[in-house]
Amino acid sequence: MITTKRDKWIYIGSLILLAAFLILKVQRGFTVSEEEGGIWNIVQGLFVCFGLFACFNLDRSKTNNPVIKTYRGFMFTVWAMAFPVVLFTGKMGISTIFHFITIPYGFLCFLWFYSCGIKNDIRKYSYLLYPTFLVTFVILFTALRSFYFLSDEKGAVADVYYIVGLLPIIFIYTPKKLRILPFLLACIAVMMTGKRTGFLALATIFILYFLPSDPDDRKPFIYRLLALLVLLIPTYYIITRLTGSFDLNMFDRLAKLGEDGGSGRSERWKKVLHTMLYDQSMLPLLVGHGYGSAYKFIGGHVHNDFLEFFYDYGFMVLILYISLFVSLIRECIKMYKAKFTYAREFGVAVIVSVFLAMFSFYAIDCTHITCCSVCLGLILAEWYKYQNGITHE
């Protein structure tokens, strides 16, 4: 495959926009008086436009993948169901129009970077994404202490999920023997912010990514496990000192994983389920209550994408959303069976996506899904080229 200079500049420009989005979003998260909106919204709008452009310009053969077809069907079904609500509510302000346009943001961002990955080798541009990962970590690290002194609001620390979401692509850019280092940085960031969902995701990644045998690694399993534990001991010490100085009590929070911890998740989940299963007729079960209803009903996100889509759009969209993750897992299994180079990294992206969808927000909000969409799109593009014997010249 021959990549033109124009293609390369388009891809580089996209990665620069991605870097700007992540850095500005994390900075915004620690500015307590910041109003909604900003240049990151412009970047989101650009990714939507780029994704729509890719929809009409990618050959059908390149999008004939179960993940892409399922994802496309899910997001555009949601978009179509949201349209009447937005049209007939009479509230057609700029904010409403923007949120309506960005409903399929995750899919369009994924499709755009899939298109870029088809035309370019993802390893050539590591110098753009790796610094973004490090800069985002530094911003998070330096701003957290002052943030806790400025406000009692803890929501902004969820920006750590941008760091966790970038891990799959960072693993690709890191030599195998050093991949534990960005993972440890992500661990430190998650422990500092006190995000238990992030901790569970990283624990799962540790078990499924680092512990299983690598075909190229001839070291016995016990040696690999001991080496990882040796690295984790000083990391535990650093994290303990940091969380102690920030008064985060992270390990107390981990000991209470079954409790709510102040986020209101359990009460929101109970309220949504009770309303859908006991207080409704059959019609809301099938088609939901309409775009944004769950957010208005409980005064915020449900912190579970499955329940929020169920409340807003009904059982049909819930099934489509579940089928999206089923297709991702199936594709990951195919990659493992084919011994695809980036199968493990694709698995990491799926793990992060599943945990965000279950305990935070993923496709329901155009924020954390950005990094996961980039990783899934780029790796799936490499998978397409692997299956079709396509190489770059």
Give the role of each language-model region.
Residues 1-59, 78-90, 102, 138-154:
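N-terminal signal-anchor transmembrane segment
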Residues 2-3, 14-16, 168-241, 319, ...:
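Hydrophobic alpha-helical segments of polytopic membrane proteins
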Residues 7-8, 60, 315-354, 386:
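Hydrophobic transmembrane alpha-helices and their immediate junctions
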Residues 40-49, 67-86, 90-115, 128, ...:
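Aromatic-anchored transmembrane helix interface
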Residues 48-51, 105-147, 154-213:
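Alpha-helical transmembrane segments of multi-pass inner-membrane proteins
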Residues 221, 236-271, 293-296:
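Flexible juxtamembrane loops connecting transmembrane helices in multi-pass membrane enzymes
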Residues 259-313, 334:
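Long extracytoplasmic/lumenal interhelical loops at the membrane interface
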Residues 346-354, 363-393:
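Transmembrane alpha-helices of multi-pass inner-membrane enzymes
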